[in-house]
């Protein structure tokens, strides 16, 4: 994300408080995944040079999209992820990430809406709060998402 993002919480604006006046912002968040910081980098063990396609989302100061498939909250400005997957004949996507109850949930639901089979690796996810995680898991299950506890289950 941008260091100048309008959604970053501060002493006057607590995290998770509403923002108005910007169509692609809804609530404030602590600064995270800022370009040029460790939080923006791939985790150890994932070599970005081995990937054919990377999505950079939320780098604009006035946007904080949750899903990886669109740059906006209305799901109209594509990141190209859906098109890339379709072009390469991919029909199943395995997901994980941060945060289960926001970005992961929205990405998974965007992929399901686009017609993909989606598997959520629960061990590869972390969320914000138990209540919102539970709600997100229910919403994803209702959409037909499959769940595995860990990657080993995928090999079985």
Predicted features and spans:
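Structural recognition of alpha->loop->beta junctions
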Residues: 28-30, 41-53, 131-156
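Active-site alpha/beta core segments
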Residues: 1-92
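Histidine-anchored nucleotide/phosphate-binding helix
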Residues: 104-113
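Gly/Ser/Thr-rich loops at beta-strand to alpha-helix junctions
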Residues: 99-103
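Short phosphate-binding/catalytic loops that engage adenosine nucleotides
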Residues: 90, 116, 145
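A short glycine-rich beta-strand->turn/loop micro-motif centered on a GG-aromatic cluster
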Residues: 94-97, 116-130
